[in-house]
Amino acid sequence: TGYLRDTAVTATAMDLDDQTAGNYVAKWEASFNFDHKQVMTLLDQINYLGAHNATTAGEIAQSVNSAASMGQIAGVDPAATAAMATAMQATGVATDRVGTSISRIYTNLSKGSNATKAQKEMWEELGFTAEGIAKSMQTDGVGTLKEVFTALQDMPDERKVAALSTLFGQWAIEGGAKITNNLGAYEKALAMVSDPSLYTGSMEREFIIQASTSESIDTMVKNSVTALKQDIGT
């Protein structure tokens, strides 16, 4: 079936085990309220990011699996979450901390009137209000993120750590600092997921290169069937 082949393509292109690939293909529809085609587009975007940055598609997918649902609530689509994960991983943030960092950033940007007194004061120091940022995230999440990180980048160096700590919390300081100091890497990754001419067919191309024999395709499809059966409990 299409699902089985798509799982095989995903596993091969991203160098994932079949069960992990099957989980992404099957479960991201419910997680992100996507149809199957949207899931495969997101996986193409992630695969392209992994091929063109100092990280891997598998690591990016792991962070997306962890943080993208929170991103959607905060006003950021999963592809943009993938771009942020890419920028953090490519600048040295450990993969197992990236998802948490991104989730904390999204949560803190969305607090609005629930922000702490210290956060409200820090937002004002940056030229924003906590309520304004929360509203802005809902209308243009990516634009708001870029605006916030640019403002942080423009702060005097001696204020940056305090600002990152106050606004994002200790668990997200490193990730926030990496984006602030490497805004170009984040913008480059965003540009990649915004251009269908770059990422469309990314996994299929990789799959064709690796699965050049009918024997290897048969093996991959059999493995995918096994993984899917385990996943749905048959």
Protein language model regions, located:
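Alpha-helical architecture feature
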Residues: 2-52, 59-66, 77-234
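Short coil/turn linkers that connect adjacent helices within long alpha-helical scaffolds
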Residues: 53-54, 71-74
